[in-house]
From Swiss-Prot:
Bilayer topology: Multi-pass membrane protein
Annotated function: Component of the ubiquinol-cytochrome c reductase complex (complex III or cytochrome b-c1 complex) that is part of the mitochondrial respiratory chain. The b-c1 complex mediates electron transfer from ubiquinol to cytochrome c. Contributes to the generation of a proton gradient across the mitochondrial membrane that is then used for ATP synthesis.
Gene label: MT-CYB
Official protein name in the record: Cytochrome b
Gene Ontology CC: one annotated term: mitochondrial inner membrane
Amino acid sequence: MTNIRKTHPLMKIMNSSFIDLPAPSNISSWWNFGSLLGACLAIQIITGLFLAMHYTADTTTAFSSVTHICRDVNHGWIIRYLHANGASMFFLCLFIHVGRGMYYGSFTMSETWNIGIILLFTVMATAFMGYVLPWGQMSFWGATVITNLLSAIPYIGTILVEWIWGGFSVDKATLTRFFAFHFILPFVITALVMVHLLFLHETGSNNPLGTSSDSDKIPFHPYYTIKDLLGLLFLLILLMVLVFFSPDLLGDPDNYTPANPLSTPPHIKPEWYFLFAYAILRSIPNKLGGVLALVLSILILAIIPMLQTTKQRSMMFRPLSQILFWVLTADLFILTWIGGQPVEHPFITIGQMASILYFSLILIIMPTVSLMENKMLKW
């Protein structure tokens, strides 16, 4: 008798995706982050659902409803901090996942890569709107500053900003719609994840060598299910250490002050995972130029496949490209640090230099070095 998992219409899909899926035999732990992102998404949806049961999306009660969750709801504090720090874990895994794709040349699978970029934008939008919901000082002013950037768009900018606000400033209408979008977008993300996996399973996974692994496949279960569970264990340990020992480590103290439109915080800054893009935005003196640079800092991922000049897919055997990849990583760390600093000397200059280096590395230096490596292959 045939196994039910191979005949049942629903279980057949699960079986071909997670059990009998042929996977390359040599994929390393850098390939764990896809499943970790799935786990993060599940944690965020579950904790978010429980938070939404007690949260009120109204400017007069939003802040106190979050306080109520932490003080009065059974285990409310743990749900709230799991959600807040879960977002940090989500972005940590996202950045590593994208970096892995760049390092090993996974961007050659264009549909999977492009859906991934759409996913990145959607997750960033969701996280931004979620940060506004507690209605603290940084929530309010962060929302004001970031939405105001759209006013830099010629002709329609001002109308667009007021349309998003639902009035002439960030107010009750803005909070209500941000809550609605923050609630619905994770389900949109889940749908996009399914499309992402659909396209991935059309081509099969890449591997560290960047070569075809058709001749050497192993079943996903039990080999990679066990491997993913180990990764999940490490992720949960890190998340629990954050939640139980220093839940506010990655947050901003200003967000413990209720939103006050009459008093601006000394340094308006987003959560750590947006700081690199915020630093690029601030490094350009012109408003429209800054907004364009901000969008391009992420959208540049879409043109990486077009900039590929190398004859080898992976960076595994390209030492010069490896060095540049880690220079780019260090540059992103510098941008993240600069984004959290005040706008004054020497931070302005460092931010501008790091921004120029970021775009130069991806657009000019890395493709040029790849061409040099092609020449060196002939020696």
